Amino acid sequence: MVLETLKQGLDSSQIHEALIQLDSYPREPVDLDASMVLIKFVIPVYPSLPERSKVILRRLASKSFTFLCQIVTFSRTISGRDGLQEIRIYQEILEDIISFEPGCLTFYLKASTTSKADRDSIKALFFGSKLFNVLANRIDMAKYLGYLRLQWKFLLESNETDPPGFLGEWLVSSFLLNPVLAADMLLGELFLLKESYFFSFQKIISASSLIDQKRLIAKFLLPYIQVIVTLENLNDVRKILRRFDLDKIISLSVLFEIQSLPLKEVIVRLMSNHSSTKFVSALVSKFADFTDEEVDTKTCELLVLFAVHNLNHSQREEIAHDERFLNGVTKHLGSNEREARERAMFIAKLLSGGHLKYESDFKINIPNVKFESNSDDKIIDFQSLKNPSICNTQTDVGKDKITEVSGHVQSLTLDCSDSDDEDENDEREIVKRIVFLKDLMKEYEKTGESRKAPLIPLLKQTVKLIRQKADFQLEVGYYAQGILSSIVCLNNEFDEPLFEQWRINALTSILVVLPEKVNGAINILFNSELSLQQRMSLLSALGLSARELRGLDDPTIVKPKFDFPTNRLPWDDQSHHNSRLVEVQESTSMIKKTKTVWKSRKLGKDREKGTQNRFRKYAGLFFYPLAHGWLNGIDVGTYNQLFKSHYLTTLRIIYSCANPVHDFESMTELMNHIISSAIEEGISLNKG
């Protein structure tokens, strides 16, 4: 009867009475039939309804998953310019439901405990992007995650004594929406906010499947903690991690991925002796292989941590006499690298209990933090976990303007002199106040209607913050991939004349500060849906970052210098080669005070040659994926010749920067083959 009444086109007071009747039903008040009537006859007038009626309508949706699903499904069928106003109404009510009704997820959960199909539908709607995709041009991902945080908060406060195991699966899906932003929202602003929330988080993980436990801890919790860990909160981090069964969750690959040495030590010290012996056996095998310097450094570091903290005297002696370990020592001693030989002897001396006589000042330093004996009894200080720091030629092709970096592009600066627009200046002030990378990333997540301001101020701030925080590798590394991906996928929506140059500058800054992120950049190049302009800009950034890492200067790249002192942790001190550079600078400043009588030209040449070559270590990461990409075939459509010419230019720049590198001959052979194929295809070689 109520549904038939609603179909007649009622006024607001009559609609209100009908909604009250629906809300009074004891069971699910809105089934499929009722949903369709409300969608067709009530929701279209939602903006004009009085607030009291809106509240009831939202409450009906919060009690009926069927109703919410039908709103989402119907919204997706609306298309075309004529439906623009209509879709906005449905978007408005959907956003109001998830923001003003924080208990809807909890209600749906309780109603679906016996049906896996229903649970999967809820997961797909909230955490599988179905709902977000409908709202995408109205709200950004950061705002959506904020709404999900409200839903999870209500769920935690509903005092479920035994959370169902599938909640861990839902939580994993929540993080996967945007791993970095979700970690900030859900961990930093909810689960690690106070003991009651963390206890619920702990119960959810404990009830989850082992694979979900590993993902929640290793893929989301540990990377987040790694960024916020300090000497002051290290004990609180230890008390958090000891709540979980790390022996089951932690693998050797996880330990290798962790860059924070103090966090690595905390995890090792929380592991049992039984698990430690298994890890050490695997580490000894890696030590014996010794194929990669970087992997070996981490292997030896972990061996020291386990030996010092988790192994007894007899276990250390057993390893010292292990045939694999002895073969590894022999292999290390035959290395041309002095540090490899020193590492092997340091560990051999440690495992032998000092009986091995070998004089050397070399040490593998570990934090070896001392915790108070009664510290386990103290509560976790969640306040200490607050994260304060997370933080050129032009070619017209049809209507698209393809910008390519060359030495003729004007020099760029970070000042505000290149715009007279007052609104842009206001936006610049807002962006300039961003000091944390997490806030920068939130700005990049803005899309559609939430993107109302020019992008150049944001790109400038990216250059400034990334280069300013160059010494904060953990923080920059945590946010870099998300920011890099967002920058590549930006469109010049406001037709800003220097947009591409600033995009390239921002990408170059990330790749120079964290060259290992080139893997992610190339993956985006090959596997993402990008426009021709986006691909060209990314290629330009790859070439320019290779040049800067090689020590070469380009006037198109902004390299701001900052007086940004860092209170570094005692185990995170600058490497010894930096101290040597300081000594040289001090000596130079003393020489300047004297009068120069005669100076050889060779002195100037030596100074030029002193430029540090950081590219050598990463040359293969830059060159080989691009080279093999060419060999696998490139086809971007109409402008394939233009793109391949720019691609080849980038590859030649990277190749020239790679010399000297140990496999330069194989690079040369591959490069010659690529150039030959380019000549056969008629690709221009006279650029670059």
Curated annotation (Swiss-Prot):
UniProt xrefs under PANTHER family: TELOMERE LENGTH REGULATION PROTEIN TEL2 FAMILY MEMBER, TELOMERE LENGTH REGULATION PROTEIN TEL2 HOMOLOG
Gene: TEL2
Effect recorded for S129R: In TEL2-1; short telomere length
Keywords: Chromosome, DNA-binding, Nucleus, Phosphoprotein, Telomere
Gene Ontology MF terms: Hsp90 protein binding; telomeric DNA binding
Gene Ontology biological process: 'de novo' cotranslational protein folding; positive regulation of DNA damage checkpoint; protein localization to chromosome; protein stabilization; telomere maintenance; telomere maintenance via telomerase
Family that this chain belongs to: Belongs to the TEL2 family.
Protein name: Telomere length regulation protein TEL2
Function: Part of the TTT complex that is required to stabilize protein levels of the phosphatidylinositol 3-kinase-related protein kinase (PIKK) family proteins. Required for telomere length regulation and telomere position effect. Regulates telomere length and participates in gene silencing at subtelomeric regions. Binds to telomeric DNA repeats.
Domain of life: Eukaryota
Positions of modified residues (Phosphoserine): S417, S419
Gene Ontology CC: one annotated term: cytosol
Assembly notes: Component of the TTT complex composed of TEL2, TTI1 and TTI2. Interacts with TTI1 and TTI2.
Keyword Cell membrane on entry: no
